[in-house]
Regions:
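N-terminal helix-loop segment corresponding to the beta1-alpha1 unit
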Residues: 1-184, 369, 375-399
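Terminal low-complexity tails and localization/encapsulation signals of metabolic enzymes
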Residues: 1-13, 235-237, 324-399
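Short, well-structured beta-strand/strand-turn elements
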Residues: 37, 310-324, 384-389
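Conserved Rossmann-fold dehydrogenase catalytic segment
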Residues: 152-160, 183-199, 221-224, 274-275
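Mid-domain beta-loop-alpha active-site segment that forms a flexible
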Residues: 161-176, 195-205, 247-251
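Oxidoreductase and adenylate-handling cofactor-binding alpha/beta cores
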Residues: 168-188, 205-212, 256-268
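Active-site Gly/Thr loop motif
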Residues: 215-231, 299
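Aromatic-enriched alpha-helical interface/lid elements that frame and gate functional surfaces
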Residues: 230-312, 316
Length: 399
């Protein structure tokens, strides 16, 4: 495999004007695929430049995590000169990804006057043009009402910014498909991705919305159970927690044999008039089944449970904290992770692209500091002389 085979977007140039999660993730994904991605920020940094978590010296671990492999330009995007300069960078690249909506100077209409075949991908909060972030979009699409303990009445937010992550992947996909379209037709595209629509589409595609429309009822809150299947968390005698899932008949039979409950489960089925070969029946009577299985889990240590589960087809894993995960072989021996020396942050294992291409994982490379590449990009992309760049720096147009 040639080096370019693992970086299929080599030669593509992209300008990113962004903050927070979705667009930075899209830009980083495209960079990991080989594109030259220039993140353009205001002088002093966008709203996410100092976002937590921070190092003891105040550097943003978060910012470094979502901007690996990019180049950084800092410009005064409120000034006409700064806007003109960034417009020229966008026109040169032919691709803009942004979640900074409502800025006329980098709108599709304004930029296509400079680059008619421009690919313009803009993430917004809501389809009606309103503002929204992952945490507020999530509140309005139903998921907090089915998250958390079954007995709880109040909404529960999930910690993972799921809609931002999904939206970022959609944005990267949009760029790749638009590049394909431009190669085939010579035309660019204007692509809008409302964050709210990503959440609503997911809720619909996974049947949460459709169930309410067709059956007339909302999904119930079931805690750590798995809807429509048998899946439950269990705790060992020494306090270790496990998630155990039996999706198939074989999984379920192995679980009953492992726990020595085959006869007890058969007796329960007779009492309830249930057929546990049916996944719906296993789900419907999940609480009774959990009561049968709990005795075995609570009588064994975490190590004993893990060793026993490894010998079966049952799907499972042990709950771990992030501090435990980083010492696990799934990180330390995973070829997706690269030992990265990140300036101002330190050395750590950083994930690259989470997919192998012809057996190779594109490795992680460091994130730039704000404005690290301003002069080089202005020279390489726009052909500005050192004197011209110096004048722009002295005037406060770039940094």
């Amino acid at each position: 495999m040639t080096p370019d085979a693992a970086r299929p977007l080599t030669g593509v140039r992209i300008v990113e004007i962004s903050s927070f999660v979705a667009v930075p993730l899209a830009g980083m994904t495209l960079a990991q695929l080989g594109a030259e991605v220039i993140r353009v920020d205001p002088i002093g940094g966008a709203a996410d430049y100092h976002r937590w978590p921070l190092t003891d010296s105040g550097e943003s671990i978060y910012w470094a995590g979502l901007n690996k492999g990019k180049r950084s330009v800092a410009a005064d995007m409120r000034s006409p000169d700064g806007q003109d300069l960034v417009q020229r960078l966008i026109a040169d690249s032919g691709v803009l990804i942004t979640n900074v909506a409502g800025r006329q100077w980098h709108s599709y209409e304004a930029l296509t006057r400079l680059r008619p075949d421009l690919i313009h991908v803009e993430i917004s909060g809501r389809a009606d043009g309103g503002t929204g972030v992952d945490y507020t979009v999530n509140a309005g699409v139903g998921f907090p009402m089915v998250t958390g303990p079954a007995e709880l009445a109040a909404p529960v937010n999930h910690v993972l910014p799921a809609w931002d992550v999904a939206c970022g992947v959609y944005a990267a996909l949009a760029v790749v498909t638009a590049l394909r379209h431009r190669d085939a037709t010579g035309h660019g595209q204007q692509i809008g991705i409302p964050l709210e629509n990503v959440a609503l589409a997911t809720a619909g595609n996974l049947s949460f919305l459709t169930e309410a429309m067709v059956n007339g009822n909302a999904r119930e809150r079931i805690g750590n159970s798995v809807y429509g299947q048998y899946g439950q968390d269990f705790t060992s005698s020494d306090g270790a927690s496990f998630m155990v899932v039996a999706l198939t008949g074989r999984h379920f039979r192995d679980l009953t044999e492992l726990t020595g409950t085959t006869k007890a489960v058969a007796a329960l089925a007779d009492t309830l008039g249930a057929d546990f070969a049916d996944e719906g029946e296993r789900y419907r009577h999940r609480e009774a089944l959990t009561g049968v299985f709990t005795e075995w889990f609570s009588a064994h240590t975490g190590e004993e449970i893990a060793a026993a589960l490894k010998e079966t087809s049952v799907l499972w894993d042990r709950y771990q904290s992030f501090a435990e995960v980083v010492t696990d072989e799934r990180v330390t021996a995973n070829p997706m992770f690269t030992a990265l020396s990140q300036p101002r942050i330190g050395e750590y294992l950083a994930p690259g692209l989470p997919m192998s291409i012809d057996g190779s994982y594109p490795p992680a490379t460091p994130a730039p500091a704000l404005g690290d590449d301003t002069a080089a990009v202005l020279c390489d992309w726009l052909g500005l002389t050192p004197e011209e760049i110096s004048a722009l720096t002295e005037s406060g147009t770039v940094a």
